[in-house]
Structures are given as structure tokens and as C-alpha cells.
Amino acid sequence: ACMLGGVAAWLRWRKKRQAQGKPFDKPNFVISTGFQVVWEKFAQLWQIEMREVPLTLEKTTLDPEEALKMCDENTICIVPIQGVTWTGLNDDVEALDKALDAYNAKTGYDIPIHVDAASGGFILPFLYPEKKWDFRLKWVLSISVSGHKFGLVYPGLGWVCWKGKEYLPEEMSFSVNYLGANITQVGLNFSRPAAQILGQYYQFIRLGFQGYKEVQYNSLQIAKYIHSEIAKMVPFVNYSEDVVNPLFIWYLKPEYAKSAKWTLYDLQDKLSQHGWMVPAYTLPSKLEDYVVMRVVVRQGFSRDMADMLLGDINNAIAELEKLEYPTPTRMAQEKNLPVEAKMFNHGGRRKTVKK
């Protein structure tokens, strides 16, 4: 879905450049360093430069002014994210749209916005209907969202919507008549299962707007509860005080980490032994020294399960704090060496993953 939105922006830009008799061989797009890997794939596969706006502890979401500094006549779009994979936060699309409107008026460009709402797209309409991040904004021309995240459908289903048919280039539509009728399709692959689409359609009909609202509200409340309990634990500090989506991250307090004999990779290892998949990872560039852990709360994760998770975290901390010597991951961190985190698969066998 992200790739289709990106390709459409690229083709629209290329067509305009061709009509103006201008070069069209150096396209670029602007996104924060909190991007999901699909955008890196898009950049490499279509040979489009990806200009990254760094995230910092002071600026935890995309800074509109910094994004505009990276734009030029070759910019095909700016990509704000709703539900950043790394942090769970939302970029301020309304502020970006306002700043971009002034920028486009000043420069004569017509740089659009593609919203990557992979996670937040199925949260915002139900829990924050007043928030403007969608087609109510002037420069938002396309939105992508994952049905298999908070859309409550099994993998892998993605949706992309355009503000109007005129923003979907004709070159992206392909028709065939050898299947018994004229069939037109927009996509990167032609043959694919319809099970996920049927699953999404079923959920829409079965749950309706109110049903989705209740499911997402419950997930968010559970996430906020875990967030508040994590904040009470001595070793940890939450990355953000806000929980706007049912996912958030935390890290070790710097003063605690200095004397700790363990790392969050060790906590991940301990929790995996109890069946919890709570990943530890480093943040993107400019923040790569921070190792964080992330919790994602989905439908069916109850308050009882949250208490079980919190209990296992507390028990794991108690075990780790009894260590007499530093763990291998702690020693590796001190020597600035690659960290080898331990993971358990369903067969009970341990495997090593380099971080």
C-alpha cells in the first residue's frame, strides 16, 4: 500500500516535469528516521532518494520546518507517519499541511502529502475523530493503512486510498479480458488471495463503527495502564508521556543503566521464556545509543494478561538485579560491540539474533 502511494506520487511528479520539459531523473521524498522498512524498499526499488529528518529526544516526531528544508523541485511527496513503528507516536499532519501550504505558495511547487497510517489509520477515526490528519487537509492526496495491524485482520493486507480518482495515474491500472470479463486492477502483483479482503469486509459488517471504536478504546486503555505501571518501575523511563496508539516504548534510566549488570536484551530473553514477545532494539540514527522495549496491545489482550506481563517483568528484574557479574550483552555494550540477543522459538530451542 505504501509503495502504491509512493509510485502514484512519483508518476504524477514525473508527468508534470515531462510536460514542463524539465529533468525528471532525480526524484526524492522526505520522511522522518522513524520510517518503516517498506519506505527503504520503495526508495531502492524505484531509485528515489529518501531524505530523512532525524528524530531526537526533543523532537520525537517529524518536524515540519525541518522537513521543508529538505524539499526542492524534485520532491515527489512528504510522508508523515501515524503510529510510528519505532515509538507509537503520531506526526502532526495538520501542522505539516499548514506549513507546506505556505511553502508551496512561496515556491510555486505543489508538493503533496502521503500519510503512512499503517498503525494509526485504524485508531484515529474511531478514537480521535476531531483530529485532522486525512483528506480534510489540502495537501493530503493519499493515505495507506494496514488491515493486519489494528484493522483486526490476519496478515498481510494493506489499503491505499486517494483523495480523488485524478490522483491515481492511469499508468498504474492494468486490464485483461482473458478471465471471462474485462478486469482492471491496481497493484504490484496480479494474482493474490482474496481471503484477507473478505476478512476485512466481514469485520466491517460485523463490528461496524461502534464496534471498532470499542475494540480500539479497550486496547488503548490497556496500553495506558501498562504504560503507567512501567513508569512506576525503578529501572525504567517511558519514551513519551503520551500514549496515542496502543503501543509505546521505554528504556533504562541513564543513571540506572550505568551500574546495571544487565540490558533490555536480557529482559527480552527472560520474558520470551514465559511466552512474551517484547522486543528490545535500538532507535534509528541520532538515537541509536538508546535501547528500548516496545509493547503493542491488540484486540483480546485483557487487563488480566497485562497484569501477568507486568508480574513477569517485575520477576525478571528481581532476577537480573541479583546477578553478580555483567551479562554478555552488558559487556558487549560497554565495548561497543554488536549485541547478540537470545530468542526462543516455539520448539523451545534458543537462537541468536545479532543487533
Per-region residue spans from a language model:
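Secondary-structure capping and boundary motifs in well-ordered enzyme cores
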Residues: 1, 31, 35, 188-192, ...
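Predominant activation on well-ordered alpha-helical scaffold segments within soluble catalytic domains
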Residues: 3-10, 40, 94-97, 197-204, ...
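Non-catalytic terminal extensions of PLP-dependent enzymes
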Residues: 7, 209-355
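Structural signal for hydrophobic packing residues in well-ordered secondary-structure cores
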Residues: 13, 17, 50, 100, ...
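A generic structural motif
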Residues: 52-58, 106-117, 175-176, 187, ...
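Active-site C-terminal subdomain of aminotransferase-like
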Residues: 126-246, 250-256
